[in-house]
């Protein structure tokens, strides 16, 4: 029986090794990655450890994306993969854990160059600014549903954009939360006399719904808000903008929403 067990273990090892050595480029072709919005100049390595050069997701350049699996993590019932993104839009690294119930993004940090986010309102990209993301845990189903998480985010977007209107905009801080099973950046101002809240909810097509509300009596701030597309409504200045991503959304949020469609 011991000899039979060794034979079984040998063949199982061969199967695992064969799967691990499967070329990344062929795996992406079988998955139809390009039809789902993922483009790249070249794929290296295997599905176990590899990289993509000049990666692009739904029209957004990512640069080089690399990953390496941790074989021993399988003993815990989940496969852990270390990843790195390096490009003009973002520089970050972290870990993804693939288990029976879905994916967990953990121990991830990234600095995002807001000026290079193609889908974002051009008025918010006129001055250089950064979005700093620190994800302790973000749980997603394999269908893409957001299940919860813990994170910290910070941006100097308003500080950068406000300078041209003599407004020292505050830093915005917050967290990445789940809204209707979708990841959402929920932020508020850090200090200052004005009351500012902002939320950007992502969809599974690479689009988003951005909403913000500002309460202020500062004339310089009001001038800046109007130039950025805010509307006076109920004693506050309100901003809403939607990018539906790669396909038209069946339903649209109530209110005045500007829509951008980035279909290929």
PLM features per residue range, with description:
Residues 2-23:
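Hydrophobic membrane-insertion alpha-helices, especially the h-region
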Residues 68-72, 97-101, 143, 177, ...:
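Short beta-strand micro-motifs enriched in acidic
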Residues 81, 149-151, 210:
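Transmembrane beta-strands of outer-membrane beta-barrel proteins
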Residues 28-35, 57-59, 82-87, 161-168, ...:
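Short, solvent-exposed secondary-structure boundary motifs
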Residues 4-7, 33, 167-264:
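Extended terminal
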Residues 38-127, 136-138:
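N-terminal beta-strand/beta-hairpin edge segment
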Residues 127, 132-199:
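Solvent-exposed beta-strand/coil patches in large extracellular/periplasmic or lumenal scaffold regions
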Residues 24-45:
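Alpha-helical transmembrane signal-anchor/signal-peptide segments
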């Amino acid at each position: 029986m011991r000899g039979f067990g060794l034979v079984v273990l040998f063949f199982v090892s061969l199967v695992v090794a064969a799967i691990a050595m499967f070329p990344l480029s062929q795996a992406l072709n079988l998955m139809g990655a390009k039809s789902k919005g993922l483009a790249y100049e070249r794929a290296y390595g295997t599905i176990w450890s590899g990289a993509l050069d000049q990666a692009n997701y739904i029209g957004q350049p990512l640069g080089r994306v690399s990953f390496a699996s941790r074989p021993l993590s399988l003993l815990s019932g989940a496969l852990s993969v270390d990843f790195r993104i390096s490009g003009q839009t973002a520089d970050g690294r972290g870990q993804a854990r693939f288990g029976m119930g879905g994916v967990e993004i953990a121990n991830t940090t990234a600095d995002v160059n807001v000026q290079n986010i193609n889908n974002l309102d051009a008025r918010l990209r006129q001055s250089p600014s950064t979005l700093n993301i620190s994800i302790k845990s973000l749980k997603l189903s394999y269908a893409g549903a957001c299940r919860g998480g813990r994170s910290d985010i910070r941006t100097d977007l308003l500080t950068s954009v406000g300078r041209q209107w003599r407004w020292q905009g505050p830093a915005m801080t917050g967290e990445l939360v789940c809204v209707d099973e979708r990841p959402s950046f929920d932020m508020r101002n850090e200090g200052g006399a004005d009351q500012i809240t902002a939320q950007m909810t992502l969809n599974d097509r690479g689009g988003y719904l951005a909403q913000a509300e500002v309460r202020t009596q500062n004339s310089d701030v009001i001038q800046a808000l109007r130039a950025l597309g805010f509307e006076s409504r109920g004693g506050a200045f309100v901003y809403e903008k939607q990018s539906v991503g790669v396909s038209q959304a069946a339903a649209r949020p109530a209110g005045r929403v500007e829509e951008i469609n980035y279909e290929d």
